[in-house]
């Protein structure tokens, strides 16, 4: 995998960091198959703005308040991590938006090539982050393609004094460059 080291974004109103997750471990609490997400019991789950599939390629955004999200993720594949979903944040709190993908098409060398566009929109509609074609995952998968993998960019938000209150929107567009499939994903949280 080719790691992406993202710059630090500092503004007087907020502080975002894109972190690089240098791991792409899989787990089996849900998967995408035949064009839909399935829960741990194998039942189809409907697409949402933050979790959807196109064909057999799936993507999912999850915003968590877990400071130990990386430790929870780095578990054996048979252990399903449990993340606390964050929908609201207050001054001094930190949250993380994780991007997951499943079932990318592999090229002739059995490698995946996934990039993504990242956009974070403040409550007033202005953009805090707008990056295109960020490397999400490139290389060989460690497990089956249908398992769930963590994409490299992780958005880390720390609510600081002066940050605008209201709804912050995160839009990530996953691109399976081998399959030529694009999945737009969106999630939001409220800063109180």
Predicted regions and their residues:
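Bacterial N-terminal signal peptides that target proteins for export
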Residues: 7-19
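Serine/proline-rich low-complexity intrinsically disordered segments, especially terminal tails, linkers
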Residues: 12-14, 28-33
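Bacterial N-terminal signal peptides
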Residues: 20-30
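Intrinsically disordered, low-complexity terminal regions enriched in Ser/Thr/Pro/Gly
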Residues: 35-192
